[in-house]
Amino acid sequence: MFHFTRRAHALCTLALLLLAVPAVCAAQTPTPAPAQDKAEEPPFHEYKGVRIGMTADEARKKLGNPTDKGDKQDYYALNDNESCEVYYDDAKKVYAVKITYLGGNAIPEPKKILGIEADTQQNGSLYKMLRFPKVGYWVSYTRTAGDSPMTLITMQKIQ
């Protein structure tokens, strides 16, 4: 049987404590939380200043006079390659915005809209929809296949 003096016993205890402290401290260090859905708000959260929840009057001030004006929807033909539809709920607030691009160079890439790449379908078209529950809406990106693709970007309140 081993017989330690008090001093030897104290030194062994101290050595064991010094070895154990870093392990205990490392176990208690909080690890950063992983990014949830890359972001709580998508990169595309407004179109020309129009956001979900904005009043119809505020949206019209941002976009100007619509080509076709209605209580539930406004249509804007911005140019030959770009149009926009803004949808309103019963409280006259924006609940959806859809932008349509017909060719041209101003088409944003999926990563700029969604924060990630869209899925390529077998026919060459692109599609991706992401829900952002913390901000209360979803965003989708659709591009048809072909030489002159049509691109639809939609942002809509989660019902």
Language-model region placement:
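Bacterial N-terminal signal peptides that target proteins for export
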Residues: F2-A15
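Generic leucine side-chain signal with a strong bias for well-ordered alpha-helical environments
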Residues: L16-L19, L63
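C-terminal segment of classical bacterial N-terminal signal peptides
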Residues: L18-A26
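Cleaved targeting-peptide boundary
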Residues: A27-E41
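A cross-family detector of function-defining hotspots
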Residues: A39-E40, F44-H45, R51-Q159
